[in-house]
Amino acid sequence: MSVKTKEKEMAVTILYEQDVDPKVIQGLKVGIIGYGSQGHAHALNLMDSGVDVRVGLREGSSSWKTAEEAGLKVTDMDTAAEEADVIMVLVPDEIQPKVYQEHIAAHLKAGNTLAFAHGFNIHYGYIVPPEDVNVIMCAPKGPGHIVRRQFTEGSGVPDLACVQQDATGNAWDIVLSYCWGVGGARSGIIKATFAEETEEDLFGEQAVLCGGLVELVKAGFETLTEAGYPPELAYFECYHEMKMIVDLMYESGIHFMNYSISNTAEYGEYYAGPKVINEQSREAMKEILKRIQDGSFAQEFVDDCNNGHKRLLEQREAINTHPIETTGAQIRSMFSWIKKED
């Protein structure tokens, strides 16, 4: 069903528990390939939803014992793929093609369902399944630990549901039921396409959530410290307080955030915001989106993976040693409510 607001009907279709049939996924064997952030959440939530699930891992995986202790059936990847009707691939994007070719492809049977939580490899053609299998996606809009936590607390994280290939005629029934199994139907399942999920997800990560946000925070911190302000104060102003502002926006929108801050801060938002995110920034965003759409970014990422992640590791080291990180570690050690890393 479509969801209506007071102003207009939303362009997307959102489905809830009453709109899906749990018996579909409960009547199928599911193989979860991988037991990382999303893998553990999918496997445990499905198991708790009464689904026959097994986890496929490489021999000697450090996650093998962890999954078994959680009550899951654990096998090697080939066995999981051979036994399953629905094979959910939840290893990292860059190794999915290799895992698919070496452990999954030979075990696919007509009528099986190949599933993903991100459309990267299907959309860009790095994995090309046979025509006689379903290809679906259940993409929770949150990290795995949140997907699991929300499920155990009785709620759920919204899911995107997509069908790329419907070989059996009931691929939509399967993906919607799968989303129910991981808790998505509790908060809403949004119908989308593989192209929409892949391109919008990558753009959001690069231009706003990860790339844009990190560079904005770094630039603010560097501007203040280069002007002679103490790094500790710069950290508080440009980094620490960010969560509080985002929480207000997340809970009730930008208007509520503006209601909650001072008039001085709100006026500064309107004055300075367009100077920081200006037409040049918007043109850069358009170029980022274009490179995502035409596959240039995907190929660059794959090339770097094939080169031993050279660029990724260099950039990771640079941010890990940036003054904002060393300052942040010192500041956060003062906060008793922040859980310390082991």
UniProtKB/Swiss-Prot annotation:
PROSITE patterns per the UniProt record, alphabetical: KARI_C (PS51851), KARI_N (PS51850)
A Pfam short name: KARI_N
E.C. numbers: 1.1.1.86
KARI C-terminal knotted domain: residues covered: 193-338
Catalytic residues in the record: 118
Example of a GO biological process term: isoleucine biosynthetic process
Cofactor detail note: Binds 2 magnesium ions per subunit.
Binding residue positions for NADP(+): 35-38, 58, 61, 63, 93-96, 144
Cofactor: Mg(2+)
Keywords for the protein's UniProt record, in alphabetical order: Amino-acid biosynthesis, Branched-chain amino acid biosynthesis, Magnesium, Metal-binding, NADP, Oxidoreductase
Residues the entry annotates as binding Mg(2+) 1: 201, 205
Pathway annotation: Amino-acid biosynthesis; L-isoleucine biosynthesis; L-isoleucine from 2-oxobutanoate: step 2/4; Amino-acid biosynthesis; L-valine biosynthesis; L-valine from pyruvate: step 2/4
Subunit structure: Homodimer.
Protein name: Ketol-acid reductoisomerase (NADP(+))
Organism: Slackia exigua (strain ATCC 700122 / DSM 15923 / CIP 105133 / JCM 11022 / KCTC 5966 / S-7)
Biological classification of the source: Bacteria, Bacillati, Actinomycetota, Coriobacteriia, Eggerthellales
Gene: ilvC
